[in-house]
Amino acid sequence: MARTVHCIKLNKEAEGLDFPPLPGELGKKIWQSVSKEAWAGWLKHQTMLINENRLNMADARARQYLLKQTEKYFFGEGADQAQGYVPPQS
C-alpha cells in the first residue's frame, strides 16, 4: 500500500515519496510532507532553472543555490523564476 502525506505544496492528501529525495534534514522534511506529484513539479522547475540560468552542477555554488530554491519552493515564498521564461499558452 502506498504511503500518503498531506502535501504542503498541493494542500491535499496524496501519495508520498518512497524515500527522502535529498540527504539531511531537508530531505527528511520533504519526504514527510511532499507528494510524488509535487516533487515531479519541482524536478521540472529545477531543470528549467538549471537550463535557463546555465548552472554548472559541478560548481558547489550552483548546488547550494538549488538547495535554497528547493526549500523556498516547498516551504518558503516560492522558488525563483527563470529570467525571460514565458509559460506556453494552452
Curated annotation (Swiss-Prot):
Family label: Belongs to the Fe(2+)-trafficking protein family.
InterPro entries hit by this protein: Fe_traffick_prot_YggX, Fe_traffick_prot_YggX_sf
Summary of the function given for this chain in its UniProt record: Could be a mediator in iron transactions between iron acquisition and iron-requiring processes, such as synthesis and/or repair of Fe-S clusters in biosynthetic enzymes.
Keywords: Iron
Cellular component, GO, one term: cytosol
GO biological process, one term: cellular response to oxidative stress
The organism's place on the tree of life at top rank: Bacteria
Any Pfam family hit: Iron_traffic
UniProt name for this protein: Probable Fe(2+)-trafficking protein
Keyword Hydrolase belongs to the record: no
GO molecular function, one term: iron ion binding
